[in-house]
Structures are given as structure tokens and as C-alpha cells.
């Protein structure tokens, strides 16, 4: 049976609909950085997602080819994730999506070294005739966070974020978004196939102790 990160690491991918604190270890990702409204048709974000999956599935299916990755095991490609911020804003402003900066990313299995990653990018670029020059091997060290499962439309996330901030404050923590630790979302539902009110999104915010 294929290894499924969502099932094996439920604390990171299947949290309750109530906020919780947790320590998130460093993880490696295939990532693309960009700017602008993620909903823009044929926009930068949609192109980035195509790049991510091209590399992710090249790695996943590599065992069927001549290039054998040491330590490979069959696995389910982890869900799409995103880091989001806006210049001059301490919190995400959903009313002005055109000002978003983002890092779209998919978690990599532990056996994917930088060398194997570079092979996969070159292989995907050649096979699919894509420009993958924006794709990068990205290590994200998230640390202590407040996390919650958000159920519903992305535009209703502020209510969940308010609950997370209140939960943290009651425990003498504050939201601590910086250039190194950002608003983080993990997308468990495909919005093209799921009713908006049923979409599941894991939301994380970095926190630190109030001095």
C-alpha cells in the first residue's frame, strides 16, 4: 500500500476544527514563488501549480523508469500547500488578492535529495516541454504554530483566523508572521469538484510567546 502522508501524519494534515498549538519540523518541498490573484484565469498561480505537479509526479512515477532513486518507496503525492503574504500587511487581506505574494508548494518525500530533485526537474521539463526555471527545492522550518481546520469558502477564513488568534492570546502567544515564517494553508479539497461550504483547508499561523 502506498505511503500517505495525510494518514501517517494526521497531526499536520487532519487537525480538528478547533485551534491547537503544535511544533512543525523542517520539511522539504518542490516550490514556485509568485505574485498576484490566485483566481486569475491563466494567471501566474495556475501556471505554478502545473509546474509543481509535473515535478511531483515525475518523482512519484520514477520507479517505472530507468532512473532509480535510492530509498524510494511508493507514496501518495501530498496535497498542495501555500505560503501567503502582502507587503506592509501583518495579516492576509482577502479583499485585495491582486497584492498577494505566495509560495506554492508540495511536500517532497524524505528520499528526495537536491540531486534527485534536479534530475526530476530536468526530466519533467524535457518530457512535458515546460519551462521549469522557477521551480526550486525549498526547505521550510515552520516551528511553533497555531493550527486549525477551516471548513468552507476561502473568503470566510478571517473568522477562523480570528479564533486562532484569540486561542493563542489566551495562552500568552501572539501571531508572529515574518519573512521567514508565513501564513500557511494546506488544501485538502479540490475546489473544482467540491462545494465551497465543504472545502477543507488546514490553516497555520506562526506564533511566539508574549514577552
Where are these regions (language model features)?
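A solvent-exposed interaction/effector surface
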Residues: 1-211
Amino acid at each position: 500500500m502506498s505511503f500517505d502522508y495525510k494518514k501517517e501524519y494526521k497531526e499536520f494534515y487532519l487537525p480538528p476544527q478547533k485551534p491547537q498549538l503544535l511544533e512543525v519540523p523542517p520539511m522539504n518541498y518542490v516550490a514556485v514563488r509568485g505574485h498576484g490573484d490566485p483566481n486569475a484565469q491563466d494567471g501566474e498561480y495556475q501556471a505554478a501549480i502545473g509546474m509543481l505537479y509535473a515535478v511531483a509526479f515525475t518523482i512519484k512515477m520514477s520507479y517505472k523508469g530507468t532512473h532509480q532513486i535510492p530509498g524510494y518507496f511508493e507514496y501518495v503525492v501530498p496535497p498542495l500547500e501555500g505560503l501567503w503574504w502582502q507587503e506592509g500587511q501583518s495579516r492576509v487581506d482577502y479583499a485585495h488578492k491582486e497584492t498577494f505574494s505566495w509560495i506554492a508548494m508540495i511536500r517532497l518525500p524524505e528520499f528526495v535529495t537536491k540531486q534527485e530533485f534536479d534530475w526530476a526537474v530536468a526530466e519533467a521539463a524535457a518530457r512535458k516541454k515546460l519551462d521549469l526555471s522557477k521551480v526550486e527545492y525549498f526547505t521550510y522550518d515552520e516551528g511553533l504554530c497555531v493550527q486549525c481546520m477551516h471548513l468552507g469558502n476561502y473568503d470566510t477564513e478571517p473568522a477562523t483566523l480570528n479564533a486562532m488568534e484569540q486561542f493563542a492570546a489566551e495562552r500568552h502567544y501572539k501571531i508572529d508572521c515574518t519573512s521567514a515564517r508565513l501564513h500557511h494553508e494546506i488544501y485538502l479539497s479540490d475546489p473544482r469538484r467540491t462545494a465551497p461550504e465543504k472545502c477543507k483547508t488546514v490553516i497555520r499561523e506562526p506564533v511566539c510567546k508574549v514577552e
